[in-house]
């Protein structure tokens, strides 16, 4: 009975995202310019949700930087931070802090309204989102994922 319930809950949670499209979520880049995820339409997208106070998130940034630099990927790699949400710095403080880091290949977008947190039901950090080429949320995975794990999930 427990197995049946577990299978039902997993199937239900996957279907909960079936209609969640993130194309029109309003974000900003590190220059405070407006961005929507729609510019990534056409390729699957991996999104790492993270926070500046999260040591596990910070430990994984070098690997995300390397993955972001790869030219032969068949999926996009972006990261999203939510200023003023879940204990994160405000926008200006985060941008100033991030500019002091050495990661030059990572695309960092800011979700100031917390829309992604709400739509994807982000419970903690790091939190990974996998979007299809139409930017529908197809899978979420909490916790750290290495580059090889990201490739496996993104290419499914």
UniProtKB/Swiss-Prot annotation:
Keywords, sorted A to Z: Disulfide bond, Redox-active center, Signal
What cystine pairs are annotated? 54-57
Give yes or no: UniProt keyword Nucleotide-binding. no
Q: What superkingdom does the record give?
A: Bacteria
Gene Ontology molecular functions: antioxidant activity; oxidoreductase activity
Name all Thioredoxin domain ranges: 19-156
Q: Which residues form the signal peptide?
A: 1-18
Q: Does the keyword Disulfide bond apply?
A: yes
Give the matching Pfam families.
AhpC-TSA
Task: State the InterPro entries in the record.
Answer: AhpC/TSA (IPR000866), Thioredoxin-like_sf (IPR036249), Thioredoxin_domain (IPR013766), Thioredoxin_ResA/DsbE_sf (IPR050553)
Q: Which family does it belong to?
A: Belongs to the thioredoxin family.
Name of the featured protein: Uncharacterized protein HI_1453
Q: Which organism is it from?
A: Haemophilus influenzae (strain ATCC 51907 / DSM 11121 / KW20 / Rd)
């Amino acid at each position: 009975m427990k197995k049946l319930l577990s299978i039902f809950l997993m199937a239900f949670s996957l279907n909960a995202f079936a209609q969640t499209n993130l194309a029109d979520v309003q974000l900003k880049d590190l220059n405070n310019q407006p961005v929507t995820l729609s510019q990534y339409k056409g390729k699957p997208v991996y999104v790492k949700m993270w926070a500046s106070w999260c040591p596990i998130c910070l430990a994984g940034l070098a690997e995300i930087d390397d993955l972001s630099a790869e030219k032969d990927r068949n999926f996009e790699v972006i990261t999203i931070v939510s200023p003023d949400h879940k204990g994160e710095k405000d926008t200006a403080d985060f941008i100033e802090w991030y500019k002091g880091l050495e990661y030059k290949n990572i695309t960092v977008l800011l979700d100031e309204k917390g829309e992604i947190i709400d739509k994807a039901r982000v419970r903690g950090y790091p939190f990974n989102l996998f979007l299809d080429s139409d930017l529908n949320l197809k899978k979420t995975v909490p916790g750290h994922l290495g580059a090889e794990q990201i490739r496996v999930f993104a290419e499914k």
